[in-house]
Amino acid sequence: MAQLIFVATLLAALGTALLAGNFFAFSTFLMKALGGLSAERGIVAMQAIIAAIKKPDFLVVFFGTAVLCAVLAGSALLHWGAPGSCYLLAGALLFLLGAFPVTMLRNVPLNTQLTAVTPDSKKGRDVWKRFQASWGMWNHIRTVTALLACALLILALAEMGNPFAR
């Protein structure tokens, strides 16, 4: 069982790292680059990004990480006091209560609004202005929470030790 929890924690740490990196890219340069375009070109570009992200390669990592974190949170509670259980619970919950719901409840609805507009319309320009004002802030939050979740999961792994070496 220790080996299974270790591997699941490693996969969750890798998942949160990949997601934090993806979110970090948006926070540090992608949204700035899109903001430098005209509203029409920015909308077209972001609509293309939104369409591309709805593919299995991203969705498996995003939802797979959430499932792993839910399982790991339960495992940490069931085996409370075991090496790494505190970090494991904290990291799993931080992703489940931070990056995951922020994405689903804030960023995705904003994406949906943006994909529904015609890029060269007044409504499109209005939605783009609101999108830029709020999407980035929510993205910063999910970036930080995914990164901190990753760090906590790595600390859990360090505290668990390598069960394959025993």
Residue ranges and their predicted role:
Residues 61-73, 143-150:
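Core segments of transmembrane alpha-helices
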Residues 7, 18-63, 113-133, 164:
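Interfacial loop at the N-terminal end of multi-pass membrane proteins
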Residues 28, 46-50, 67-79, 102, ...:
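Membrane-helix exit/interface motif
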Residues 2-16, 77-97:
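Interfacial segments of alpha-helical transmembrane regions
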Residues 89-108, 112-116:
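Acidic/histidine-rich alpha-helical segments that form the ligand environment
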